[in-house]
Amino acid sequence: MKKISNNIFLIMLIFGTLVTISSNSWLGAWMGLEINLLSFIPLMNDNKKNLLTSESSLKYFLTQAFASSILLFAIIMLMFLYNNNLSLYNSFNEILILSTLLLKSGAAPFHFWFPEVMEGLSWVNGLILMTWQKIAPLMLISYNFIYNFFMISIILSMLIGSLGGLNQTSIRKLMAFSSINHLGWMLLAMMNNEMLWMTYFLMYSLLSFSIVLMFNNFKLFYFNQIFNLSMMNPIIKLLIFLNLLSLGGLPPFLGFLPKWLVIQNLTAMNQLFILTISVCLTLITLYFYLRLSYSIFMLNYQKNSWMLKNNFNNKMSSISLIFNFISIGGLVMISMIYIIM
């Protein structure tokens, strides 16, 4: 019964996003966002015995409900001003709408809820929050943005996403700050090319799915669990290490490709200042990924009895290896296809 209800909520979740991105009015987009929100809340409460999960779902609901209320207020104000032939909405109202959409997507400076909510979720729900739940807000943001306000959000997202992950011991919080950093890159791509941010989002979703699949199969939530896992299987340790570097955007992995496309686009547009800041802040994310990887490879940890159980079945192993191969060697394959063509 629970599985059937979860499938219904998952279908409604997808339906809500499709309603938002296909709507031709702000009110229809708002309704789609609400359907999406009310479908995701039951999915978040997959473990009612875990108080941290209940706390995360409550935080998510309060944050999204507040953003939806402000968005509805801004939409009503927009309709009122438009019907009365007033042009006052051009400044305040656009900032209000953009702020609520940035809050819903978890971009800085409205990111405060995102790491805390991620900490209490399962890996499957965390993956949905990092990927699918960003589609509708980002699509609406692409319709309506203010350059100066947008630029502030981009720089803050990259800065907080980089510095926030430095002293983390929780993998879920690290992935949350990494998502904030990548969101800054998506917004930067959105400023110059509408298709570019979609390409970046697809690549990021693929990389996130690849690494979250491994974390979920091994029930990894904290770094010390990865250290103990390294005593069991060096190959799995290596795959996690390479996936982290790919997610950080280090060449020659697939994660470098979307950043490379954004860098090329910014260079062509002669936006060298924001490009320099973006690359420098991305180096910080690579630093804490490399620091974590160094600890996994070089340091020895005592084997704990609770880590002896291997949850990695053959079916999931095959799926994970396929996605890991794409994540790690995708850029090489794309380069070979490009050379052949």
UniProtKB/Swiss-Prot annotation:
GO terms for cellular component: mitochondrial inner membrane; respiratory chain complex I. It is found in: Mitochondrion inner membrane. It catalyses: a ubiquinone + NADH + 5 H(+)(in) = a ubiquinol + NAD(+) + 4 H(+)(out). One of its GO terms (molecular function) is NADH dehydrogenase (ubiquinone) activity. The chain crosses the membrane at residues 8-28, 61-81, 95-115, 145-165, 174-191, 195-215, 238-258, 272-292, 321-341. One of its GO terms (biological process) is mitochondrial electron transport, NADH to ubiquinone. Its main location: mitochondrion. It is a multi-pass membrane protein. It holds the Pfam family Proton_antipo_M. Its EC number is 7.1.1.2. This is NADH-ubiquinone oxidoreductase chain 2. It comes from Anopheles gambiae (African malaria mosquito). The lineage of its organism: Eukaryota, Metazoa, Ecdysozoa, Arthropoda, Hexapoda. The gene is mt:ND2.
